[in-house]
Amino acid sequence: MYGTERKETQMEMTEQYPGYNHRVQYYETDQMGCVHHSNYIRWFEEARIDWMRHCGISYREMEKQGIIVPVLGVEATYRQMVHFDDLVDIKVTAAKYNGIVLEFCYEIYHQKDGKLCTTGKSRHCFLNKEAKPVSLKKENAVLHQKILTFIGKDVQDPDKKQDS
């Protein structure tokens, strides 16, 4: 895709996600010359889909199996402006997962100086075609395991007792 660069290297699922790179396009900027706030949410999605590919999860295959993943909520905090032709690195972390709901955290950094520009998070749930919640652990153990394998200790298995 023009204007975006994705690291094509297939990595072991246990390795940390290397992040997603994006070059800011002119159409993504506003009259003030900085990136319009709505584009950050789109970049989060691009990075999240790239994270899924890295994890060995095909969004298209999930949909073929009748699983959809709507956004429950998304937020962004803007710390530093980003401008046309800037290169940014987008880091994605799967922060919480219980088999039905998956929350991602995002950090966007300027490539030129490594400064943090934006932070954010998004919450998603797994549903069937009838829009009913799906427990991946019960309905799609392979997909559930891929998520657990990739994010490892960052995730709480819902069947494990948690400390209060």
Where are the regions that the model predicts?
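Generic structural detector for well-ordered beta-strands
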Residues: 21-25, 77, 125
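A broad, structural micro-motif
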Residues: 35, 69-71, 117
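Hydrophobic beta-strand-centered segment that forms part of the acyl-chain substrate-binding groove
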Residues: 51-96, 100-102
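HotDog/MaoC-like acyl-thioester-processing domains
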Residues: 2-13, 18-20, 82-84, 95-164
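Catalytic strand-loop segment that frames the active site of acyl-thioester-processing enzymes
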Residues: 2-51, 164
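Solvent-exposed, charged/polar functional surfaces in cytosolic regulatory/catalytic domains
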Residues: 50, 77, 146, 150
